[in-house]
């Protein structure tokens, strides 16, 4: 066990420091904004330091372990630890949350509560990625929903209450299955209940019961990922939310579902996963085509980007279903890659709306001339989204594609049909992406508006965009920097789990 509680400090610091926001002197929103920025940067630096000096990337075992007994009655522990699967999402969470806080500077209404909720969300996400107790996993899963619901319902568009209600109904409904599965696994087959993921990973179940557990967990994670047909909350939520909230939703929240699918469904229920993996491949391929086709018909800019996120999650599902080292590595890399790309696109969509006050694509046009910097940045991130070689999107899709081709589990016909469907999705992506850019930036429609003078992006927007672009380019040119964090853990998951 680690003697210094690094992870506990990292999890608790944002919410503890955030609670002090309400005691800051009333000297305007600037003090609150810079205080939140400093806390976010401090948290990111602390996380980076702990991982650089106390984490061994070539060790697949759980590291920085902390285990404190919380409720003795049913063996509930505050049990934390990280490995190759969790270090990437944790660092992504710190990076995106810091940038989303910087993006939230225009927020002036109830600024104290807004920034407090962002820090609470920060703690919940870090806690979920670092917990090693199944019941604690559920508590973090639920705890993180509260600030998201309040951020959606209080800041956003005219239909924000509708979208927030839809979000909480979907996610709370999925959480019921997560709780039932956690209690079922924790209480099964032993005199003393345990929720320790280390013990549960070595436990075996009857085939029928394991399938039931798998389906329950899958429904919970499918809502958050999201997987069709449980995705309909996402476009409405993104369409109404403030863009800093959208950055957190697209960059981190969706990845929680993918993380749970690997951490619980693959690690704990490996036999059932091998049985259901062909269906995952089919669902992933259908999702790529369906979401890309639906995105093309969206008038709302943010809803079009939201459907593109759903489409890209299809590649992640296929990587998880391939049951190969390469495919799972590609899926984990897609978690990081899309976290950056999705956050960047929603940020630029939000800054564009702040300037022109238009959200429907058929009302836009000609923005490239008055706002060339935003045009350039949006074009670059659109290229990253459609998997331009040299950027992270291309690498992740290629690795997932290669992982499917080399999988020994599937017949030749499946290795032909699924990549064929994936290729159609890859063709559809530039169609809706370039169509979006054409409607926004070309033509003369915007000059007919009463106020045809618009400010281009300032230093804050440029800094944010460059900060997100550099990791996208870095992963695209040298993906092994990220893959090296998880490659040993992926090998252990597949060798230990599927050879039992």
Curated annotation (Swiss-Prot):
Gene Ontology terms: biological process: ATP synthesis coupled electron transport; electron transport coupled proton transport
Major site of localization recorded for this protein: plastid
GO cellular component: chloroplast thylakoid membrane
Transmembrane segments: 4-24, 31-51, 84-104, 111-131, 134-154, 167-187, 212-232, 242-262, 272-292, 308-328, 330-350, 386-406, 411-431, 462-482
Source superkingdom: Eukaryota
Keyword list, A-Z: Chloroplast, Membrane, NAD, NADP, Plastid, Plastoquinone, Quinone, Thylakoid, Translocase, Transmembrane, Transmembrane helix
Cellular compartments annotated: Plastid, Chloroplast thylakoid membrane
UniProt xrefs under InterPro entries: NADH_Q_OxRdtase_chain4, NADH_Q_OxRdtase_chainM/4, NADH_UbQ_OxRdtase, ND/Mrp_TM
Membrane topology listed for this record: Multi-pass membrane protein
Enzyme class, broadest EC rank: translocase
Pfam families registered for this protein in UniProt: Proton_antipo_M
Catalytic activity line of the entry: a plastoquinone + NADH + (n+1) H(+)(in) = a plastoquinol + NAD(+) + n H(+)(out); a plastoquinone + NADPH + (n+1) H(+)(in) = a plastoquinol + NADP(+) + n H(+)(out)
GO MF annotation: an example: NADH dehydrogenase (ubiquinone) activity
EC number of the protein: 7.1.1.-
Family: Belongs to the complex I subunit 4 family.
The name this protein goes by in its record: NAD(P)H-quinone oxidoreductase chain 4, chloroplastic
Originating organism: Jasminum nudiflorum
Organism taxonomic ancestry: Eukaryota, Viridiplantae, Streptophyta, Embryophyta, Tracheophyta
